[in-house]
Amino acid sequence: MDETIWLIISTVIIVLGIAKFLLGKSSSSSLSTMEWPVGPKKLPIIGNLHQLGGDVFHVVLANLAKVYGSVFTIWVGSWRPMIIVSDIDKAWEVLVNKSSDYSARDMPDITKIISANWKNISCSDSGPFWHNLRKGLQGVALTPLNVASQYHLQERDMKNLINSMYKDASRKNGILKPLDYLKEETVRLLSRLIFGQDFQDEKLVVGMHHALDDLVRISGYASLADAFKFCENLPSHKKSIREVHEVKKRVENLIRPHIVSNPPTNTYLYFLKTQDFNEDIIISAILEVYDLGVDSTASTTVWALTFLVREQEIQEKLYREIVNVTGGKRSVKVEDVNKMPYLQAVMKETMRMKPIAPMAIPHKTSKDTSLMGKKINKGSVIMVNLYAIHHNPKVFPEPYKFMPERFLKDVNSDESLGNIKTMESSLLAFSAGMRICAGMELGKLQLAFGLASLVHEFKWSCSVDGKLPDLSEDHCFILLMKNPLEAKITCRIH
């Protein structure tokens, strides 16, 4: 959002806020007497809103950290103040060492609609309900044995995806946008883990893809009312609420026919049906798997492909490693990816540079605690800036340069690449501690398999000679490309 738009928004909010105050209708929320970490000076009503424009949120906050330190406070309108953590040691204290103290959530009001009033894994506070739901997902659907039993189906889907890409690109001089293909492939993978291996509902695949796209779009415009409650009556916010309800109805119509079935015992749906959950919670839990799994996996794969288009030497080095494992005479198998250290390094470097959730999900203290020895009151909101941590030059030398080699032990004797142990512990793409992403292992596996397969089958290059793909970011809770990758693909001859 450019500075002109931010100026307009700020002006409107100031006028509305002053009017509300003069009319005696402003809320008088009593903030804690806690001494908040020093941050930029706030203005009445709008807090620090005027200082949060001009770039994507995580970059703005990373720049503020250079001025105010690795732990500081920002005030976003009528929200409680938010503590921003931009250093790995402090992040580790919040996420791991005192994980239970910081395990509650602070979610935008609009998320209530699609989360059964915050009754899912990502939105609910830690407690018996959260623990049971997370245990069901990981201990039933996402067990290594259950995931491995579907490798042959992943490989079949990948073969179909590659054939579709080739056919579609052939009609357009080899030009292709890979994102939508990868989204639908991920929906199929997750659907089998949710409903069973015999899942074949293409209507759900396409419908869920479009529903998730709409939720991401709406989320980018619906957060103003969380900061300024008097904005809840604005037509734009009411429109966003209506749109979310409409998307929810579409999702319900896609999922409901499957709920009445008798799912296999190794599926997420089976677990959900064995609990005392109403239909709204079951649908919310299923939607959450898609919501957190589809865009994150597909978009990270496309970010990786974008870097490989820009860095052809790295792409060819990766291709040679893949061929060394496959022998060049067969397609990539899921089991192959753990034999490819350079592939793993490319993945890590992609997630370092473009963490899919650069500010993670907001944490809230569940009790009085401390940070760096200073008291933090119960109910305080903390956001960890993963982007800032991943771009710390003291940990990652030349942090804005794409260098997978920094994560390889056999070349890491070069001190200019950084300390590999420190870098590994500072890579928090899936967060850390008790609220670490429940689907982390599946996400890493699908990302590695998808990337290896696409590089094995196609050479990826610029769609227009000499014009490198854009790395600009469009942040709507997750880190998307402002201009999704369009590349030229050429079949490789093995």
UniProtKB/Swiss-Prot annotation:
Predominant subcellular localization, coarse grouping: endoplasmic reticulum
Tissue expression profile of the protein: Expressed in roots and at lower levels in stems, leaves and plantlets.
Top EC group: oxidoreductase
Cofactor needs: heme
EC assignment: 1.14.19.65
Influence of pH: Optimum pH is 7.5.
Molecular function via GO: (S)-cheilanthifoline synthase activity; heme binding; iron ion binding; monooxygenase activity
Cellular location(s): Endoplasmic reticulum membrane
Temperature note: Optimum temperature is between 30-35 degrees Celsius.
One Gene Ontology term, aspect cellular component: endoplasmic reticulum membrane
Binding site for heme: C437
Family: Belongs to the cytochrome P450 family.
Protein name, UniProt field: Cheilanthifoline synthase
Organism: Argemone mexicana (Mexican prickly poppy)
Classification lineage: Eukaryota, Viridiplantae, Streptophyta, Embryophyta, Tracheophyta
